Amino acid sequence: MSDSIIVFDKVKKAYGNFTVINELDFEVRRGEKVSIIGPSGSGKSTVLRILMTLEGINDGAVYVGGEPLWHELKNGSMMPATEKHLRKMRTQLGMVFQQFNLFPHMTVLRNLTEAPRVVLGLSKEEARRRAEELLELVGLVDHAHKFPAQLSGGQQQRVGIARALAMRPKIMLFDEPTSALDPELVGEVLNVIRRLAAEHDLTMLMVTHEMRFAREISDRVCFFDKGRIREEGTPEQLFSQPKEERTREFLKAVLDG
């Protein structure tokens, strides 16, 4: 576990009688780019939500940077770490959601500067300088004083990526970042993620239905089915020579569809 920045150890997550994550063992190494693929309802997005403590777990253990996110109580229930501990942990994680989740009443610039000032204690000047650098990275420096409603979906998602990066995370989580976009806007978001993967020393974990993109940027691809990893390997291994029949069925459906 020494080189793994994310560890799931026999994690279980259920809603009543429906098990979403089924004794999941899963690790991501520092600096690794990992894509999670699989059918709807297989637990892909739940993995990211657990990492952000947006969802709890019923059993097992989750570690980020070697530190536990959850503690088991004497009665067997799972409780998150202390709020102080979680605040520290969350600064290591940046998440890009499907639906952008920008603050609609704030300009693009303020969307990027608010959390670094409040949470990290950056000065107004430091936060602004960092925000402008990130807007340059995502190609939106000329839109700094617009409000989210004045932007296209693709532009809003690029702001979402910049906002996550503004907290200087070690890990970036992407939850199907193009699923809410019109087809013609997908490319501009993928180009930003592609640049991050190539130029920045970030650990990246991405849930995606963009198979060709996952194949291009990933060090490893994991196929989820029924709350577990059914198969994993390099993009070449998993896409060209999948071992499991269920993996072959899924890839045939999504690539030929």
UniProtKB/Swiss-Prot annotation:
Entries under SMART domains matching the protein: AAA (SM00382)
Subcellular localization, as worded in the UniProt entry: Cell inner membrane
Keyword terms of this UniProt record: Amino-acid transport, ATP-binding, Cell inner membrane, Cell membrane, Membrane, Nucleotide-binding, Plasmid, Transport
Binding-site residues, ATP: 38-45
GO MF term list: ABC-type amino acid transporter activity; ATP binding; ATP hydrolysis activity
Major localization listed first in the record, in broad terms: membrane
Bilayer topology: Peripheral membrane protein
Entry GO CC: plasma membrane
UniProt cross-references to Pfam families, sorted A to Z: ABC_tran
Domain ABC transporter: residue ranges: 6-251
Function: Probably part of a binding-protein-dependent transport system y4tEFGH for an amino acid. Probably responsible for energy coupling to the transport system.
Family, per entry: Belongs to the ABC transporter superfamily.
PANTHER family referenced in this protein's UniProt entry, alphabetically: AMINO ACID IMPORT ATP-BINDING PROTEIN (PTHR43166), GLUTAMATE_ASPARTATE IMPORT ATP-BINDING PROTEIN GLTL (PTHR43166:SF9)
Protein known as: Probable amino-acid ABC transporter ATP-binding protein y4tH
Annotated source species: Sinorhizobium fredii (strain NBRC 101917 / NGR234)
Classification of source organism: Bacteria, Pseudomonadati, Pseudomonadota, Alphaproteobacteria, Hyphomicrobiales
